[in-house]
């Protein structure tokens, strides 16, 4: 009976840890963001410059030739 109570308490503690870790980590991230300022955390994605949203006519022609 004691073992079952200990297992139940440990399970409840683990579930609380998992459910509250998201809020805890978000608080840490927000605090670090305030320390660094708004400019420090902007544009962290380094791959935005690699994507070109416009496809030129030459690109379309190349793709059509490639698919033949």
Curated annotation (Swiss-Prot):
Residues 1-23 form the signal peptide. Keywords: Amidation, Antibiotic, Antimicrobial, Cleavage on pair of basic residues, Cytolysis, Fungicide, Membrane, Secreted, Signal, Target cell membrane, Target membrane. It is found in: Secreted; Target cell membrane. Residues 37-68 form a propeptide. The modification Leucine amide is found at residue 36. Expressed by the venom gland. Transmembrane segments: none annotated. Belongs to the non-disulfide-bridged peptide (NDBP) superfamily. Short antimicrobial peptide (group 4) family. This is Antimicrobial peptide VpCT3. It comes from Mesomexovis punctatus.
């Amino acid at each position: 009976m004691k073992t079952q109570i200990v297992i139940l308490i440990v399970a409840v503690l683990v579930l609380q840890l998992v459910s509250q870790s998201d809020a805890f980590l978000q608080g840490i991230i927000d605090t670090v963001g305030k320390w660094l300022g708004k400019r420090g955390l902007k544009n962290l994605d380094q791959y935005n410059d690699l994507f070109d949203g416009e496809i030129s006519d030459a690109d379309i022609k190349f793709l059509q030739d490639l698919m033949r």
